[in-house]
Amino acid sequence: GTLEIEGNFLGEEKITAIIEGKRVLGTVKELAEVQGAIKAYEKLDEFRYSELADLLLAHKILMDEILTTAGSFRSVNVKVGEHIAPKPSIVNELMINLFSWLKNSDEHMLLKSCIFHYEFEFIHPFSDGNGRIGRLWQSVILNSFNPIFSLLPTESIVRDYQEEYYKAIEDSTQLAESTPFIEFMLEMILKSIQNIIFLCFH
C-alpha cells in the first residue's frame, strides 16, 4: 500500500513473489523500492520509536538501493506542492526536537503517532522517501503502543484515500496546525480496525 501511494505499481502478486524470492519483471527502481520496503517492515518490532538513530537506519534500509544519501538528512531545499520545507541547515535541530517531544510528551500514543507523522512530513527531512518513512514510522509508534497495530493495513487504507491524505496534509499546513491531518489519520486507523473486525467475523 505505501509503495502504491508513491507511484510504484508492481502490484500485490509481484510483491508477494519478491517476498518468496522469485524473479519478477519491473524497473530497477520499482524492485529496489519493494525490496527496501520489505526489509524495513520486517524490522518493525526492532525499531525504537523515540530514537532518531533508528529512524535514520530505517531510511537507509528503505532507500539504500535508490538514494546515495540514504540514512542522511537532505542538504538541499525542497518544495512539495505549495509547501516550502524548512532549510536544510535546521533540519537536524528540528528532528532532534521532534524526537524529544515524541519521547517526553504525555499525549496518547494514537495522537502522538498522527502528530509525529504530520510534523515529519512538514519538515521533509530527506531528499526522497519522506512519505514512505513517515507512514512506516507511524506504524512503528503504533506497534510500540500495541502490537495489534502491526496487523492493521493502515497504509492500504491510506492508499484507497490517497487524495484525502494529501489534502489533509495541505489543510494542516495552511492552518499551521495538525488537526485536519490528525482527524484524517485517526479515521484511517479506525477503518483499519473495522476491516480487521469484519474479516474476523465473516
Where are these regions (language model features)?
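FIC/Doc superfamily catalytic core
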Residues: 1-202
